UniProtKB/Swiss-Prot annotation:
GO terms for molecular function: small ribosomal subunit rRNA binding; structural constituent of ribosome. GO terms for biological process: translation. Gene3D superfamilies: 3.30.70.60. Keywords: Ribonucleoprotein, Ribosomal protein, RNA-binding, rRNA-binding. The keyword Cytoplasm does not apply. Induction: Strongly expressed during exponential growth, decreases 2-4-fold in stationary phase, part of the rpsF-ssbA-rpsR operon. The operon is induced by DNA damage by mitomycin C. This is Small ribosomal subunit protein bS6. GO terms for cellular component: cytoplasm; ribonucleoprotein complex; ribosome. It holds the Pfam family Ribosomal_S6.
Amino acid sequence: MRKYEVMYIIRPNIDEESKKAVIERFNNVLTSNGAEITGTKDWGKRRLAYEINDFRDGFYQIVNVQSDAAAVQEFDRLAKISDDIIRHIVVKEEE
């Protein structure tokens, strides 16, 4: 099992309840595929360095996980097709 840091940006025009549902849904994607979430950080709404899909702001969410590659690949696949996540990145942490 490797350690990963997953960062994703949720669109800014989402209501609070839907935002929590998106976070819960993507945390469940990781845990249902065998990942162990070791930490989460909500950075809140921040200004983007450049415009993405006509958005200038976004809600940043960081999740630290310990998992195999399958869970991270499934997260990546679903984040790409989700309309609520405007950008995401997965970084493998050094041992």
